[in-house]
UniProtKB/Swiss-Prot annotation:
The gene is KLRD1. Residues 1-10 are cytoplasmic. Natural killer cells. The chain crosses the membrane at residues 11-31. PANTHER family: C-TYPE LECTIN PROTEINS (PTHR22800), NATURAL KILLER CELLS ANTIGEN CD94 (PTHR22800:SF252). InterPro entries: C-type_lectin-like (IPR001304), C-type_lectin-like/link_sf (IPR016186), CTDL_fold (IPR016187), NKG2/CD94_NK_receptors (IPR050919), NKR-like_CTLD (IPR033992). Residues 68-175 form the C-type lectin domain. Glycans are attached at N83, N132. This is Natural killer cells antigen CD94.
Length: 179
């Protein structure tokens, strides 16, 4: 009887061991596949929510541009200095992103990168101005008074604007107004 209990115990523990090993192998394969998928996906999603293009009822944007509320946005995948970014946008008949309201902040909220925006300090006006000369609205970035006037402004996914050296390289967003 003791031999039977020992044999039965070995059979049960062996079966459970094989099941555990199978589960661990399956878990390892699933984790490997999910990490591979996560590392590949960001390369194909450069920034803000591309679904916004479907909501654009009054504009037709060129290829690689995203439409949202009668504006087209180019979301760069390469990093440039602020001046290089500004010139590249101008060559596309657009300008660095100028945020008009919190809706555009929502448009940016799905991004996980830093982007140059078209905000710089005007020594002549002693104020932060958008590329078109309009003043920065204080409700967009409540802490804007702490920015260093010698720096340029990058936007981050948490809804904050940060001042960085204009020679640093960041991704950028160009905005083209259609109306």
């Amino acid at each position: 009887m003791a031999v039977f209990k020992t044999t039965l115990w070995r059979l049960i523990s062996g079966t459970l061991g094989i099941i555990c090993l199978s589960l661990m192998a399956t878990l390892g394969i699933l984790l490997k596949n999910s990490f591979t998928k996560l590392s590949i996906e960001p390369a194909f999603t450069p920034g803000p929510n591309i679904e916004l293009q479907k909501d654009s009822d009054c504009c037709s944007c060129q290829e690689k541009w995203v439409g949202y509320r009668c504006n087209c946005y180019f979301i760069s995948s390469e990093q440039k200095t602020w001046n290089e970014s500004r010139h590249l946008c101008a060559s596309q008949k657009s300008s660095l992103l100028q945020l008009q309201n919190t809706d555009e902040l929502d448009f940016m909220s799905s991004s996980q990168q830093f982007y140059w925006i078209g905000l710089s300090y005007s020594e002549e006006h002693t104020a932060w101005l958008w590329e078109n000369g309009s003043a920065l609205s204080q409700y967009l970035f409540p802490s804007f008074e702490t920015f260093n006037p010698k720096n340029c402004i990058a936007y981050n996914p948490n809804g904050n604007a940060l001042d960085e050296s204009c020679e640093d390289k960041n991704r950028y967003i160009c905005k083209q107004q259609l109306i």
